[in-house]
């Protein structure tokens, strides 16, 4: 019984274990399933995103429109990136990195600008004469469209008499040893020669006109063209030139007109249908110009307003324009013919205008004419004129076949020279030609009809001679008249027969070919010319800088008053007013002698003549002084001579108000003959110090016993009422003058008062160093032996803004009269300390003068105003 119970218990336990294990397995399966679902979702999301990227990448790839698989899309993308990397490397290798090339211009823009400046164009021809590239500038020089020349033989545009010589020149690179000997080879593969080229015309039936041109270039092997660009090259050169082009050599040259032109046409337009508006009066004068006009014609609105529109039109178009304007006045609106407009860059641009007349809203009278000008290309103009002549305009067959065979718009005239020779791909990359030149106002260049050369189309081969040419050249405002010019001598007579079908001549096989560098010889020649031009420009810049420096120096001298205004703002000036002079007499002055001051001799007769005119000539010394700080900031001063002179009038027997800047040197009278006035002005360091002792020695010199001093020039001349003292508060210190002989001529005392205006802001004065106190005490003891002058206290100086120096009496005596004057002219800041040598010298002078002086009475008193 017990066994049965235990067995039942064990079986129940086993059942529970099995159920728990099953439940655990189910839970694990659920977890794994959830993980798989999540993983599948993320994988599907990743695949969808990858497919979207592949589809987007495939849509960006050029070529087939059919659906491509993923591997094809990736392969084409890799090929494109590899080709792009190669092209970038080639572009960087051929980039012009010299200093003479502006950094803001690309190679194409720089090349086009240089060609326009040189009156030339690029031409790439095969050795058999087939033209594979021509730059757009050929239109403005020879009136040919690039499409007229490409895939044509160069011999079709050269006189028959010159075919043999040109063919011989183009074939020189095929010779083994004799190829470097001809005279037209400059260096290695570079050559230069001259010939005539046919000028394009609107009417092919017109007589042929040739221009004398110069070819400068070198040969370039087409083996250097990358393999990835061969397909593009096959689309560029046509039909018969495709086989064995790897073994061919082309001649790349810069073709320049032998005779430069003055004004040339601007014939290419990168952005068609460019337009701008203007308003004209009924007399066809400009009243308004649109903001879109300056980038096109170069003129700003204010440059053309008020001028007649006929001033900018080509003389050959005036007759047709006059008819169009007559039609406008009759019908009120209309469209003009194609005409040429002279831009600010002295180039002709083709325009067509739609215009109408606006009427006043009240009286219905004509008010002005509104014009909308549209820029057109020379190709449109030529096609329109040929249609008027009944000539069917058609592109060359080769060009038409080329566009059909290549299957893309790879116009050779818009492909740069580098692409035509190195990449030859399908994508057109227009060179920056007309727009850059049209928007830049460069100087005059040429007129397309200036120097044509008439050459008769004869089957014979006569020797080349001077070829006369006569054609009228229109210039703006009729400033240039018609000119007749003779072309240059072409050279020796032709020695070989004419080869009219040079394009069909076979090229020998197996001949050696030269491997040339990527740098074109034409660009090297252009570089040399630009370097020479750069040196000339630099010389002009240096000369202009030197002239500018001289002008600035003169302006600094002329505009010295600006510095004076700065000093008057930063430092207070001096105001000398109420110069009181007692009754004087100038009739006793009999003789004037030169005055020697500071080592300078001033003739007093010249000063006398100036005083008779009632003026005192003052020469200005400009002093540049920095603001004095409250701390120990040193003063800096600089004297600059000025070309101006200041006239100050003094009237005798009256009061005069003298306002002088800090740098004035007054001219004051001195009647004594042979007198020499030496006026060193001291700078006291404290306003409470004793006054300066002034002595007059036997040699009639004024000397001061102060230490280190600033010497003030005081040139004297006779004046009727005494002397005028002009001190300089900031720099000059005390200024005293004396007249030993003038006192003998007067019977009553004279009073001399000088007003000094104190600064508006009184800076705290620095104390004198301790080592200078014994010297001051010694000086004070010496001054006590003589009649002293009382000095006002510090409180008096601060309360009264002006101080006076009065001399109450001048005693009569011998010429060595001693005069003690005190001038209380305190400074803002600490002044220069007195030197020991000067103080010792002053003491000796005082001791010497003590034996020679007379008694003095009533020392001068300083009284506040």
Swiss-Prot record:
The organs and tissues expressing this protein are described as: Expressed in brain, retina and harderian gland as well as in peripheral tissues, kidney and liver. Localizes in the brain to the suprachiasmatic nucleus (SCN).
Q: What induces it?
A: Exhibits no circadian rhythm expression.
Chain segments carrying region Implicated in the circadian rhythmicity: 514-564
For the region Interaction with NR3C1, what residue ranges are annotated?
371-864
Phosphoserine is found on 38, 42, 408, 427, 431
Site (Interaction with E-box DNA) residue list: 39, 43, 47
Protein's cellular compartments: Cytoplasm; Nucleus; Cytoplasm, Cytosol
Q: How is it modified after translation?
A: Ubiquitinated, leading to its proteasomal degradation.
Q: Which Pfam families match?
A: HLH, PAS, PAS_11
Give the enzyme class: transferase
Task: Tell me the keywords, alphabetical order.
Answer: Activator, Biological rhythms, Cytoplasm, DNA damage, DNA-binding, Isopeptide bond, Nucleus, Phosphoprotein, Repeat, Transcription, Transcription regulation, Transferase, Ubl conjugation
Q: Where is this region: Disordered?
A: 420-494, 620-653, 755-803, 822-865
Q: The PAS domain covers which part of the protein?
A: 107-177, 262-332
Task: Name the chain's protein.
Answer: Circadian locomoter output cycles protein kaput
Question: What gene is this protein a product of?
Answer: Clock
């Amino acid at each position: 019984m017990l066994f049965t119970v235990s067995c039942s218990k064990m079986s129940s336990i086993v059942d529970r274990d099995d159920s728990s294990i099953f439940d655990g397995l189910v839970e694990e399966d659920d977890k794994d399933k959830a993980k798989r679902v999540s993983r599948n979702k993320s994988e599907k999301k990743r695949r969808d995103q990858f497919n979207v990227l592949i589809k987007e990448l495939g849509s960006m790839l050029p070529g087939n429109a059919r659906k491509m698989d993923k591997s094809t899309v990736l392969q084409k993308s890799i090929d494109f990136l590899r080709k792009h990397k190669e092209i970038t490397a080639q572009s960087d290798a051929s980039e012009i990195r010299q200093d003479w090339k502006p950094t803001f211009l690309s190679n194409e823009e720089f090349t086009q600008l240089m060609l326009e400046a040189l009156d030339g164009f690029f031409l790439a021809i095969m050795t058999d004469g087939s033209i594979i590239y021509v730059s757009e500038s050929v239109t403005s020089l020879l009136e040919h469209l690039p499409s007229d020349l490409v895939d044509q033989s160069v011999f079709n545009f050269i006189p028959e008499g010159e075919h043999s010589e040109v063919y011989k020149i183009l074939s020189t690179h095929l010779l083994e040893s004799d190829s470097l000997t001809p005279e037209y080879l400059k260096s290695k593969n570079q050559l230069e020669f001259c010939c005539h080229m046919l000028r394009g015309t609107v009417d092919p039936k017109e007589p042929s006109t040739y221009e004398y041109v110069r070819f400068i270039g070198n040969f370039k092997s087409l083996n250097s063209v990358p393999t990835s660009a061969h397909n593009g090259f096959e689309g560029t050169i046509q039909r018969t030139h495709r086989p064995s082009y790897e073994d061919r050599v082309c001649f790349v040259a810069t073709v320049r007109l032998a005779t430069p032109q003055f004004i040339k046409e601007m014939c290419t337009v990168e952005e068609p249908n460019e337009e701008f508006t203007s308003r004209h009066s009924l007399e066809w004068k400009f009243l308004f110009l649109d903001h879109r006009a300056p980038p096109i014609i170069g003129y700003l609105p204010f440059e053309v307003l008020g001028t007649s529109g006929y001033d900018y039109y080509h003389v050959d178009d005036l007759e047709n324009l006059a008819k169009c304007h007559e039609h406008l006045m009759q019908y009120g609106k209309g469209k003009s013919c194609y005409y040429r407009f002279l831009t600010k860059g002295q180039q002709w641009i083709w325009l067509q205008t739609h215009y109408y007349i606006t009427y006043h809203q009240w009286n219905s009278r004509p008010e002005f004419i509104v014009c909308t000008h549209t820029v057109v290309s020379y190709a449109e103009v030529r096609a329109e004129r040929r249609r008027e002549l009944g000539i069917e305009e058609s592109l060359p067959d080769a060009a038409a076949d080329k566009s059909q065979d290549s299957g893309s718009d790879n116009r050779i005239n818009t492909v740069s020279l580098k692409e035509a020779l190195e990449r030859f791909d399908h994508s057109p990359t227009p060179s920056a030609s007309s727009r850059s030149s049209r928007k830049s106002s460069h100087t005059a260049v040429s007129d397309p009809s200036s120097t044509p050369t008439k050459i008769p189309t004869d089957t014979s081969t006569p020797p080349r001679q001077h070829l006369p040419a006569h054609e009228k050249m229109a210039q703006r405002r009729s400033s240039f008249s018609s000119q007749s010019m003779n072309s240059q001598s072409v050279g020796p007579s032709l020695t070989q027969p004419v080869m009219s079908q040079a394009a069909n001549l076979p090229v020998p096989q197996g001949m050696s070919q030269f491997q040339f560098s990527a740098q074109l010889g034409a660009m090297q020649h252009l570089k040399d010319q630009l370097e020479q031009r750069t040196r000339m420009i630099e010389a002009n810049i240096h000369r202009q800088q030197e002239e500018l420096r001289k002008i600035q120096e003169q302006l600094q001298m002329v505009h010295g008053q600006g510095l004076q205004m700065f000093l008057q703002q930063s430092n207070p000036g001096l105001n000398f007013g109420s110069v009181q002079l007692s009754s004087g007499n100038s009739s006793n002055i009999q003789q004037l002698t030169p005055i020697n001051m500071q080592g300078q001799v001033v003739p007093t007769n010249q000063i006398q003549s100036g005083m008779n005119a009632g003026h005192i000539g003052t020469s200005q010394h400009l002093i540049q002084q920095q603001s004095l700080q409250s701390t120990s900031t040193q003063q800096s001063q600089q004297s600059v001579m000025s070309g101006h002179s200041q006239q100050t009038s003094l009237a005798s027997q009256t009061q005069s108000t003298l306002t002088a800047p800090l740098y004035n040197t007054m001219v004051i009278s001195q009647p004594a003959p042979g007198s020499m006035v030496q006026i060193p002005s001291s700078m006291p360091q404290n306003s409470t110090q004793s006054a300066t002792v002034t002595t007059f020695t036997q040699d009639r010199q004024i000397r001061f016993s102060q230490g280190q001093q600033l010497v003030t020039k005081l040139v004297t001349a006779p004046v009727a009422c005494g002397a005028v003292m002009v001190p300089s508060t900031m720099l000059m210190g005390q200024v005293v003058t004396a007249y030993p002989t003038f006192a003998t001529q007067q019977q009553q005392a004279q009073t001399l008062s000088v007003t000094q205006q104190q600064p508006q802001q009184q800076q705290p004065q620095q104390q004198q160093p301790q080592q200078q106190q014994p010297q001051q005490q010694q000086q004070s003891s010496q001054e006590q032996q003589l009649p002293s002058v009382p000095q006002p206290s510090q409180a008096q100086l601060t309360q009264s803004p002006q101080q006076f120096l009065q001399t109450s009496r001048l005693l009569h005596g011998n010429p060595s009269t001693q005069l003690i004057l005190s001038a209380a002219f305190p400074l803002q800041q600490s002044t220069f300390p007195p030197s020991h040598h000067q103080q010792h010298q002053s003491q000796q002078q005082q001791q010497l003068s003590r034996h020679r002086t007379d008694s003095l009475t009533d020392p001068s008193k300083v009284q506040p105003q």
